[in-house]
């Protein structure tokens, strides 16, 4: 059972998450906020709904995380005067500045995870995992 692919993938994901969580904590950033920051660094000015969809979480989860991120000064939420229905999320300078500190941590985790592995095997593993994701899309 422990050698089944699903088990190995889950354990590897847990190990990656655990390592990154510890590194992020040194900067006072939670793993939950990391996902939203990564998305916003690539696509600032999303609605809460768009952010939820891209992060793959429910809107109440996003709303709670954004409330905390706003209190920490990472983001601002705004409504347009002509459309008060949608809430848009914007990074603050503080939220943007975190990128320079946090992205190298994620890169370091990925490097540590594949240390000693042949680059061709890492590339093959990545292709297989991407194929699994594609095959099991809902």
Model region roles, listed by residue range:
Residues 1-27:
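N-terminal leader segment of winged-helix/HTH proteins
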Residues 3-7, 27-38, 63:
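Short alpha-helical elements of helix-turn-helix
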Residues 17, 67-127:
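Charged, amphipathic alpha-helical coiled-coil/dimerization segments
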Residues 37-40, 99:
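Hydrophobic residues on short alpha-helical segments
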Residues 39, 54, 72:
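Residues within the alpha-helical elements of helix-turn-helix
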Residues 43-47:
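Short capping segments at the starts of secondary-structure elements
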Residues 57-61:
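Helix-turn-helix DNA-binding motif, specifically the short coil turn and the N-cap/start of the second
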Residues 123-138:
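Exposed, interaction-prone assembly regions rather than primary DNA-binding/catalytic cores
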